[in-house]
Amino acid sequence: MLQSIGGGPSGLYYASFYAGLRDMSVRLIDVQSELGGKMRIYPEKIIWDIGGIAPKPCHEILKDTIKQGLYFKPEVHLNERVVDIRKKAERHFEVETEAGEIYTSKAVIIAIGAGIINPKQLDVKGVERYQLTNLHYVVQSYRRFKDKDVLISGGGNTALDWAHDIAKIAKSVTVVYRKEDVSGHEAMKTLVTDLNVKLCPKTRIKYLVGNDDETHISEVVLEHVESGDRHTVKFDDVIISHGFDRCNTLLSETSSKLDMHDDCRVKGFGNTTTSIPGIYACGDIVYHDAKSHLIASAFSDGANAANLAKTYIQPDANAEGYVSSHHEVFKEANKTIVNKHLY
């Protein structure tokens, strides 16, 4: 059994898929309720820099990545936070979760990206009532804002990006932020202004006013941060873009102390090998001299880690697997695909 910690692109596509290709059984653990990692934060953004993949929204790439990552039916555990990794002996590791579950494996791949990432929550009384309706921390689809009056709280690049894209289809877009000026790119500020986005500096959300059954936000009380002046405005949807809380305590608190780079990334030794044999790191969490932080690089890292894990678990195994076009495991699936394209 190979243990993969993290369900983002690196952990999914190659630490899971490629390990299956190499005839390894895989257990994948992720702290989130859904697979995808950081890619779920920007589902509508267009991804251009994956070789051989035409530019398309991130959520479409993620859908294919998850499908491929689950091809060999890995054992998937969601909503489980790993708190410790222990090497008991060669090819004998224990991974413990916050709930006290202990999983054993012969090798471990760490693919946790920048750690646990969650959007910073709006600090307003009763906010939790609206999180399943019209209060959003991530924009899943621009279409839902068509002909709507939309409020965005935040002055960074993400807030301005959303304002720019949503303004093209919404009835109105208002952006509030605490500072005198937005912190996002000046060029983007000009673009949103040209789209008649209303920018409200030194303004914050003070209260959310619900509808009769308190399931949807109907109005927002806005407050000037200096004067304290307040006014109430009707909005159909409210989007919060206050940044993210990041947690990466696993690497600092684990029993298996790995060599680190700048105290925040695992030090890789020219590849995905770490300072502890049998533990590998891939994706954004690993650093080495040739590292580039791209989705495409995460895929490559995952394949490298899976190959190294294979030869660690089975020393007489080939260093690399067969290319997929000639792999026996896809023989029947290839027939279906060929017939689909020929007839």
UniProtKB/Swiss-Prot annotation:
This is Ferredoxin--NADP reductase. Belongs to the ferredoxin--NADP reductase type 2 family. Homodimer. FAD binds at residues 10, 30, 38, 42, 82, 117, 284, 325. Binds 1 FAD per subunit. Its cofactor is FAD. GO terms for molecular function: ferredoxin-NADP+ reductase activity; flavin adenine dinucleotide binding; NADP binding. HAMAP family: FENR2. Its EC number is 1.18.1.2. The keyword Transport does not apply. It catalyses: 2 reduced [2Fe-2S]-[ferredoxin] + NADP(+) + H(+) = 2 oxidized [2Fe-2S]-[ferredoxin] + NADPH. Pfam families: Pyr_redox_2 (PF07992). It comes from Staphylococcus aureus (strain N315). Keywords: FAD, Flavoprotein, NADP, Oxidoreductase. The keyword Phosphoprotein does not apply. InterPro entries: FAD/NAD-bd_sf (IPR036188), FAD/NAD-binding_dom (IPR023753), Fd--NADP_Rdtase_type_2 (IPR022890), Ferredoxin-NADP_redctase_2 (IPR050097).
